[in-house]
């Protein structure tokens, strides 16, 4: 830009039409700069700088030096599709450095309470909760969730999907794994640090939500401050998100003519929020870019450095804006005008050019939309819910009216049709044509039950229309209310809500209940996970354990890290929204991280009445045990059989834990021995015996620790036996393999030692002799087999276990176990869970319900207090800008009235002059 006058004139050319929903406004000042989202300078080439200063009349002819050769539309699409993605793995991570240019804030700051607000009530989806491994997988990407289809997040408080579902990405801040890089020409950009799937959530576009007067003032203010890059995004009509000084990493997403991301708006609670999503599968290392798709730079084009085959060579400019619409892609799809010829605003050459003096409404009216399909119905309802432009709402409603297919109409009704149409009525209540369109659609819907009408509360809105001055509106409103009054309410049995934190009565009930829960889950596009394995779960799964970081740790938490140790007596849990709270065994809960150990309540001394009751009970017990007469021979044999059976069933419950473990070990060992016998010719007998004992002890310890044993003497099921045998076989196969490798190595070491010694003693080394291995470890040779170090880690100390050789050799073997090359019972992924279970602390008690939400609001950190003060300052700025705007409008109105009055006075004076033939009216 050459001077401030050019900058001011260019700002005046910025269009603030509602159609520019996805506008991101950037303003360049004195120094010619590349169009980038970075907060730093990057020089243009000399040619680009000169060409960027061309006048408005020359702007249509973009310099060829900056512009690649033109390709046909089909050729450019083929090149873009076949081109391998460019990776930026070689660039350093500049995330920390990029934070120096702006203030990171966790959420948008609103200039007033009504900014960003929507008229939609919190709507409930029809999904059913799908609990797997403690996580609710309902409302996922592949589900048929109507909230997700209409771009609305489910409530954290829970509904049909039981809360905590997968359609809460904005609320949980489940951002993608990205980093900030510094490109050669475009400045800062965003790089994917892991593979991303289509429609993955990258970032919410966060900043200060301001009104239009504040937006205009800031454009001038930033220019005076010398700020090179502005970051404005149009959120709604006369509402903007300004991420210039405050925001998050989403502000660094650059422009591309062949984007891999798109910007979309979602309803989250009572606010409309903007997010960046992936449009295709993205490899790790790719830059994340989207198409700005709007005239933000006046009539003069700015060079585009995306480097794509279909690059038009510039961003903005007269040529591009004549041929492209500023409507977002989602609205274009909802209008049904992205048909066979395509709707590609990034390609300069189009089948049908937009006339220079033609606006978006005229352009859309000239294109015939395609017929409504089920997929289109979802897009139409999603766009209609957020629509504030009357002409767009009319086109969307007309698409619904023109549809006569019953299945499509049912799909429209399913997409919260009554609630969305109620919002449309309230938005355009003063326009009789729009109201009549909505009433005709409501009358067209099939009427089966009264449920949807009653739940949407649309009757109250229709009731007000019965008194309308417009006869058609009043009559149709009365007709609808009369028809709805004849419908009956269908009652449904509410589904039982599954509480993942509720403890089961016992481990067997927990497994069987989980299995039934999974069997009853019905999903149109998901496959239920297999039924959990019954006890004992020795081998469990061979796959390594991983935590689901995408769902739990996707966002950057403002709280301290919770993996640090808590004070004694405190435990953590998460509510349905994913917020972490803390609790004690006594049920005390708090949102604030505790710093002191939980105080144990002092044991209350028994009262006098309690002492007397205990004494009486003790006497009764003694009399019962000693004074009960034995059964005489008179008793019938049948009567004598029942009590011993009951005693037998209850006997094991009175035994100590070690006795129960021994009984359970005897139950497991026959199945373990069955596999051991098949390896008697592969491993020494004594070692096999020791392996069997240690494996049995390990399985017993694990099952008792995890409460998987109900009756230690009960026979095992076929499934349990199969799992145990498979685990023992896998373990012994690895033992045989390692045994053979070590035997071969020991033999080679022995031969080498014999050659070195050149003596008869070395040549005669055999059974029971000791040789030095290459690693300096003493190896016991038994019939040419080195088994001294074959050992397994037992759960507890063992005495009398079978071993080889003398006690000295046993002690040596115990000392060398850690360095033994042989497999142990803790080797391999199959035993990873068992080992982790032993090292874990005792399981915490089940968490109580979370504290009230009001308590969470009271926990205000210093950062939150600072953000609150900044938001209050932003509110004052918006109010001041609005006040000045209103005063300017009022002053202009007075000036117009004064000018009109002066003009009338002048005309009157002229009329009174001599010779005047006409008096002014």
Curated annotation (Swiss-Prot):
It is an enzyme of class 2 (transferase). It comes from the Eukaryota. Residues 24-37, 60-69, 521-530, 542-555, 624-636, 817-828 have a biased composition (Polar residues). It is found in: Nucleus; Chromosome. InterPro entries: AWS_dom (IPR006560), Post-SET_dom (IPR003616), Set2_fungi (IPR025788), SET2_Histone-Lys_MeTrsfase (IPR050777), SET_dom (IPR001214), SET_dom_sf (IPR046341), SETD2/Set2_SET (IPR044437), SRI (IPR013257). Residues 1-78, 346-365, 503-565, 624-647, 741-921 are annotated as: Disordered. Residues 120-174 form the AWS domain. It catalyses: L-lysyl(36)-[histone H3] + 3 S-adenosyl-L-methionine = N(6),N(6),N(6)-trimethyl-L-lysyl(36)-[histone H3] + 3 S-adenosyl-L-homocysteine + 3 H(+). GO terms for molecular function: histone H3K36 trimethyltransferase activity. Residues 300-316 form the Post-SET domain. S-adenosyl-L-methionine binds at residue 292. Residues 842-853 have a biased composition (Pro residues). Disulfide bonds: none annotated. Residues 176-293 form the SET domain. Residues 508-519, 741-758, 865-895 have a biased composition (Basic and acidic residues). Residues 761-776 have a biased composition (Low complexity). GO terms for cellular component: chromosome; nucleus. Residues 564-596 form the WW domain. The AWS and SET domains are necessary for transcription repression. Histone methyltransferase that trimethylates histone H3 'Lys-36' forming H3K36me3. Involved in transcription elongation as well as in transcription repression. This is Histone-lysine N-methyltransferase, H3 lysine-36 specific. It comes from Gibberella zeae (strain ATCC MYA-4620 / CBS 123657 / FGSC 9075 / NRRL 31084 / PH-1) (Wheat head blight fungus).
